Amino acid sequence: TDGRSFDAKVVGTDAPSDLAVLKVDGSNLQTLPLADSEKVRVGDVVLAFGNPLGIGQTVTMGIVSAKGRATAVGPANDSYQDFIQTDAPINEGNSGGALVNTQGELIGINSQILSPSGGNIGIGFAIPANMAHNVMTQLIDHGNVRRGLLGVSVQAVTPDIARSLHLDNA
């Protein structure tokens, strides 16, 4: 908001988490302390910062609606499945903005909305700060994110599957 502009160097990107680490050389840059996002509780008051629809910086208020939410968005639906859900309005342009608790600590990074119209209907998702910190650390240390892969997927057991596996019920 002070009108300064900086060039940034891309340190690393991670498509599955939709996160990147950028290096900016500057002075008097403000930072946010990271909260332990595991300690976030449903009902906690949160503030969502961003630039919705390109109108300029804004802050909206809401609560944490749920934790551990999954979305079906991302390359081959492989996006992380541990989002913080909030009803703080997150609209197009808020992605990458901060989701902050009332102590001014970063609890998440605004990432997605779930909406049939593309506008906010009170279902927004943020990447938890702990996950973002893990991705950031790996990008800085290794240039990429290392993940384990089991080669297993989960699906509901339907009556047809139950019969094929000789199960008593689905």
Label the model's feature ranges.
Residues 1-170:
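Serine-dependent protease modules
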